[in-house]
Swiss-Prot record:
The name this protein goes by in its record: Zinc finger protein 14
GO annotation, cellular component aspect: nucleus
Keywords assigned by UniProt, alphabetized: DNA-binding, Metal-binding, Nucleus, Repeat, Transcription, Transcription regulation, Zinc, Zinc-finger
Any one GO BP annotation for this protein: regulation of DNA-templated transcription
PANTHER family: IP01015P-RELATED
Gene: ZNF14
TM segment ranges: none
Zn finger region (C2H2-type): 103-125, 141-163, 169-191, 197-217, 223-245, 251-273, 279-301, 307-329, 335-357, 363-385, 391-413, 419-441, 447-469, 475-497, 503-525, 531-553, 559-581, 587-609, 615-637
Location of the protein in the cell: Nucleus
Native organism: Pongo abelii
Main location: nucleus
Molecular functions per Gene Ontology: DNA binding; zinc ion binding
One Pfam family cited in the UniProt record for this chain: zf-C2H2
Length: 642
């Protein structure tokens, strides 16, 4: 069995963590370290530096870094059995008892207990970086690849890992590996949820010391931008801000070449290539690439809505939704497009709009190749492939792919319509619906197709129209493989498989799969036929029927088969015709399994099992399975030859 090394048992503090300890905790740390030294038996090297606190005060270095490095280095030449008298003992020197620090820096006047500590400190003034390492056979302390020199051997060893890419610290939960121990420690907190830094004023806790520092209530912002005057609490934030003026983007992705001004944005971007999702929900097991997405997801379980409007009391899951809502009270639209001058109530909406001018779409779907302007749009699109529906209605348990669809559905239970049109007084459940409605008053159509010039009031209609040019059909039925341009058409199609008929006639209780079918059916009871043909006077129940009828006068047949050239008046007849070429029979009888090309055919066939004959002759009482058979029978009474 391998002997235990000092690295295996030593406790490591960062400079920030050390600053949070009180005097009793620091004393306890020194006692523990002392006990650790005494229990190790295979070390072999006399220690020059016996001042733990001087080690800590070396700015930017670990609390015990010199101690660790020298102990670990000395093990290579040590012999087992040497006594522990060679261990450093912070209490054995006279200076330690008295607290005297006889070694003074001639540059800055700082005092040190030990000469070795003073020597190391002097290098910060002289810039000296010794090129020989005495304990390693006089080998130069230089890195061969870049000829970079270091003042301390432990820094040299750490730097080497940046070239060798050795990552000795691996997370047991997600497998992510790290070059250095401290980032590994910090990463582990993201899994454990540990937040060791607590604000004494408000009780808020933080994973990272830097976040804790930035949160401070002092109000001090010592770092001010000379160009715009904006001030910052921490230097890193100030540095990042300066890059917005200079345009500097020092962090470049090796896979796609995209550059970033901030390392956090760069690391986040890398996950789009690796697919890494380090944040996992304990309740449902769903994993996320970004901490912010993970936090937002947790609210779907807890129901927490931390953002509340002071005017109307409405609460929101997300800060962005809250900010957008607040503006509905004021009517302000402070964000203006630089190209066309259009104003928006949120910066995000403005940025999305600006991409319509430049055409930038950096996020591409790996399954179908479609690209998007925003990562959130890509994630939402991916659900059309996976069928994922993470949003569930608490009242009826219906699930949805998008949070917006859930919110829209929830209003069917509450009936709430908080958004009112100032011109006509009409109310809406959503601000987006109000915005679309307002365009009917001002005739605004901001979404224009670059291919044909057609303009649209609504971005969703515009996207659907674009598919008529590209031929894209992103919604695929898992049962029969049929694909659709619109999600609404896809959902309606699914009902042909499930048999779901949610729309019921109040007069005769007949049910329908589609609301449009119910509306058309209701006209049968009223007998009203409001759509009349101007040429022949024939009246129809539906506007779609009169449009088809008018084509019999004009001879227009807009739907042409690419295989045989045959043209059709209606899209439905065209689709039916296509099946004669493909042989597709998507409609199957649930009782005997027989398949049919047309839904009407399967309905008529099913009546052969049920015995239903809905078409009855008023003259003789004879009943028929299908309307076509019934019409043929009627002619026998009129004297027509069938």
């Amino acid at each position: 069995m391998d002997s235990v090394s000092f690295e295996d048992v030593a406790v490591n503090f960062t400079l920030e963590e050390w600053a949070l300890l009180d005097s009793s905790q620091k004393k306890l740390y020194e006692d523990v370290m002392q006990e650790t030294f005494k229990n190790l038996v295979c070390l072999g090297k006399k220690w020059e530096d016996q001042d733990i606190e001087d080690d800590h005060r070396n700015q930017g270095r670990n609390r015990r870094c010199h101690m660790v490095e020298r102990l670990c280095e000395s093990r290579k030449g040590s012999k087992c059995g040497e006594t522990t008298s060679q261990m450093p003992n912070v209490n054995i020197n006279k200076e330690t008892f008295t607290g005297a620090k006889p070694h003074e820096c001639s540059f800055c006047g700082r005092d040190f207990m030990h000469h070795s500590s003073l020597n190391r400190h002097m290098r910060s003034h002289t810039g000296q970086k010794p090129n020989e390492y005495q304990e390693c056979e006089k080998q130069p302390r230089k890195h061969k690849a870049v000829e970079k020199t270091f003042s301390y051997h432990h820094c040299f060893r750490k730097h080497e890992r940046t070239h060798t890419r050795v990552k000795p610290y691996e997370c047991k939960q997600c497998g992510k590996a790290f070059i250095y121990y401290q980032p590994f420690q910090r990463h582990e907190r993201t899994h454990a949820g540990e937040k060791p830094y607590e604000c004494k004023q408000c009780g808020k806790t933080f994973i990272y010391y830097q976040s804790f520092q930035q949160h401070a209530h002092t109000g001090k912002k010592p770092y001010e931008c000379k160009q715009c005057g904006k001030a910052f609490i921490c230097y890193q934030s100030f540095q990042r801000h300066e890059r917005t003026h200079t345009g500097e983007k020092p962090y470049e992705c090796k896979q796609c070449g995209k550059a970033f001004s901030c390392p956090t944005y760069f690391r986040t971007h890398e996950r789009t290539h690796t697919g890494e999702k380090p944040y996992k929900c304990k309740e449902c097991g769903k994993a996320f690439s970004f901490l912010s997405s993970f936090r937002r997801h947790k609210r779907t379980h807890s129901g927490e809505k931390p953002y509340e409007c002071k005017e109307c009391g409405k609460a929101f899951f997300y800060s962005a939704s809250f900010r957008a809502h607040v503006i509905t009270h004021t009517g302000a639209r402070p964000y203006k497009c630089k190209e066309c001058g259009k104003a928006f109530n949120s910066s995000n909406s403005c940025r999305v709009h600006e991409r319509t001018h430049i055409g930038e779409k950096p996020y591409e779907c790996k399954q179908c190749g479609k690209s998007f302007s925003w990562s959130i749009s890509l994630r939402l699109h991916e659900r059309t492939h996976t069928g994922e529906k993470p949003y569930e209605c608490k009242q009826c348990h219906k699930t949805f792919s998008f949070s917006s669809s859930l919110r829209e559905h929830e209003t069917t239970h509450t009936g709430e319509k908080p958004y009112e049109c100032k011109q006509c007084g009409k109310t809406f459940s959503f601000s987006s619906s109000l915005q679309r409605h307002e365009r009917t008053h001002n005739a605004e159509k901001p979404y224009e197709c670059k291919q044909c010039g057609k303009a649209f009031r609504c971005s969703s209609y515009f996207r659907i129209h674009e598919r008529s040019h590209t031929g894209e059909k992103p919604y695929e039925c898992k049962q029969c493989g049929k694909v659709f341009i619109r999600s609404s058409s896809f959902r309606l199609h699914e009902r042909t498989h499930t048999g779901e008929k949610p729309y019921e006639c109040k007069l005769c209780s007949k049910t329908f799969s589609f609301s449009s079918s119910l509306r058309e059916h209701e006209k049968i009871h009223t007998g009203n036929k409001p759509f009349e043909c101007k040429q022949c006077g024939k009246a129809f129940l539906r506007s779609s029927q009169i449009r088809l009828h008018e084509r019999t006068h004009t001879g227009e047949k807009p739907y042409q088969c690419k295989q045989c050239g045959k043209a059709f008046i209606s899209s439905s007849k065209f689709r039916m015709h296509e099946r004669t070429h493909t042989g597709e029979k998507p409609y199957r009888c649930k009782q005997c399994g027989k398949a049919f090309r047309f839904s009407s055919s399967v309905r008529i066939h099913e009546r052969s099992h049920t015995g239903e004959k809905p078409y009855e002759c008023k003259q003789c009482g004879k009943a028929f399975i299908s309307s076509s058979h019934f019409r043929l029978h009627e002619r026998t009474h009129m004297g027509e030859k069938v």
